[in-house]
Amino acid sequence: MSFSLGELAASLGATVQGDAGLIVKSIAPLDQAGADQLAFLSNPLYLNQAVSSGAGAIIVSPRDLETLESQGHAAGRNWLIAANPYAAFARVAQRFVALAARPVVPGIHRTASVEEGARVPASCSIGPNVTIEAGAVLGERVRIAGNSFVGADARIGDDTLLYANVSIYHGCVVGARCVLHSGVVIGADGFGFAPDFGPQGGEWVKIPQVGRAVIGDDVEIGANTAIDRGAMADTVVEQGCKIDNQVQIAHNVHVGAYTVIAGCAAISGSTKIGRYCIIGGAANFAGHLTIADRVTVSGGTSITKSITKPGGHFTSVFPFMPHGDWERNAAIVRGLTRMRERLQQLEQRVKDLQQQS
């Protein structure tokens, strides 16, 4: 399980400075890599680690290599030069993982339940205790691990992987080459209840959720994330999105292509997130908002209004500090209204005095 440095460079569209025949057996961090390993430098803050690294070769940008050469640290080393070292590292890592991957054996486990009318190609691998209901359609080479559920009339595209205990509800769509980690639920009912209360009490009346959840191609969804089905129209996650663990996407949300959402974020119903957005962990969005393309939202931020200008970076988190300092600042914040009123009174007195003079 190894590659020559030249092979890796060719697969990346990169170039080699040094020994293209060097055999690379694995990847490792700069400060841990050995002579048969490949490391990467994607941040100039770690230039010193690159200098002292024992790696057989290092993925580096042209700019950082130029810096190392100017300092006299590049000679006699092996460099794989790529415009985006971090992305190059990711692609190399994929190649090594593919080499070591457990072979996929097509077939349906004897304990799986595949109802009549479901379409499961012979190239699929269906694990133990999987349930596939009537009308469900799987693409080629779909892999479904144990205890997962695919509801009636659901659709799953080619080469998609469902880890154990994933649930795809009836009528929902998952695209090609997707990865859904354990505990993901696609298409559960959205949180829709109409209040019907009077003087004598009443109840919350459930609104049937008759839309679908539609997931595009090349989407990865982390463990225990829920994407609810739409109330009437569909909930949509477009192609290329990457969603972390424990994210809640409510009914009728629309997430634009190639947006990334970190863990524990929550997006309320009917909010539309643009393309190429970056959503930090535990960020939360009110419902019925529109967020422009390429917007970045810091972790823990609460978004309560639409963002119409593309490309901004938004933060609402109060920075951490020692607890005693936080208590003092909180006390000041509580008194801001009173301070504002006093300031307005003082301003008025100054105006009155100026007029008298």
UniProtKB/Swiss-Prot annotation:
Catalytic residues in the record: H251
Keyword terms of this UniProt record: Acyltransferase, Lipid A biosynthesis, Lipid biosynthesis, Lipid metabolism, Repeat, Transferase
Keyword Lipid biosynthesis: yes
Keyword rRNA-binding set for record: no
Catalyzed chemical reaction(s): a UDP-3-O-[(3R)-3-hydroxyacyl]-alpha-D-glucosamine + a (3R)-hydroxyacyl-[ACP] = a UDP-2-N,3-O-bis[(3R)-3-hydroxyacyl]-alpha-D-glucosamine + holo-[ACP] + H(+)
Any one GO cellular component localisation term in the record: membrane
Biological process, per Gene Ontology: lipid A biosynthetic process
Enzyme Commission number(s) of this protein: 2.3.1.191
Single GO MF descriptor: N-acyltransferase activity
Pfam families: Hexapep, LpxD
Pathway given in the UniProt record: Bacterial outer membrane biogenesis; LPS lipid A biosynthesis
Record's function text: Catalyzes the N-acylation of UDP-3-O-acylglucosamine using 3-hydroxyacyl-ACP as the acyl donor. Is involved in the biosynthesis of lipid A, a phosphorylated glycolipid that anchors the lipopolysaccharide to the outer membrane of the cell.
Family according to the record: Belongs to the transferase hexapeptide repeat family. LpxD subfamily.
Subunit and partners: Homotrimer.
UniProt cross-references to PANTHER family, sorted A to Z: UDP-3-O-ACYLGLUCOSAMINE N-ACYLTRANSFERASE, UDP-3-O-ACYLGLUCOSAMINE N-ACYLTRANSFERASE 1, MITOCHONDRIAL-RELATED
Protein's recorded name: UDP-3-O-acylglucosamine N-acyltransferase
Species, as recorded: Ralstonia pickettii (strain 12J)
